């Protein structure tokens, strides 16, 4: 399909079950542990934990996984790790973050979890070294 005028094709991501065997089992994907990805402020609801796991398993360019989470019972604040490659931001950062956030939303739909994605100006204005606040996910109990 042609792309809209002024836009160019950048990336494609397939969803669904494979016809044959996967080229790599999920356990060999070398994803960061929950302990490295999350700062737990409260014990999360099971639903909140399901969404974090979906985000943790999201693919990223060069397996960079440029995200961190601050976790509460029914909410999760998403931060982008500000990694620099040669002094400038990776061109793939926004795509990586978008894929991860799409994984959260797809998991919410799959598991029938009612969520709202929000943005907190207060969090966005707080400087956190090497991190940029992206948004928050609220889980409705």
Label for each model-derived stretch:
Residues 1-141:
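Acidic, surface-exposed loops and disordered segments
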């Amino acid at each position: 399909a042609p792309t809209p005028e002024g836009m160019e094709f950048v990336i494609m991501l397939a969803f669904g079950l494979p016809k044959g065997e996967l080229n790599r089992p999920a356990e060999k994907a070398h994803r960061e542990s929950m302990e490295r990805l999350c700062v737990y402020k409260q014990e999360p609801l099971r639903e909140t934990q399901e969404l974090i796991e979906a985000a943790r398993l999201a693919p990223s360019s060069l397996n960079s996984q440029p995200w961190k989470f601050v976790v509460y019972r029914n909410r999760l604040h998403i931060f982008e790790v500000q990694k620099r490659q040669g002094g400038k931001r990776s061109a793939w950062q926004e795509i990586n973050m978008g894929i991860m956030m799409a994984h959260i939303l797809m998991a919410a739909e799959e598991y029938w979890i009612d969520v709202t994605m929000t943005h907190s100006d207060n969090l966005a204005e707080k400087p956190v070294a090497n991190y940029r606040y992206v948004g928050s996910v609220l889980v409705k109990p």
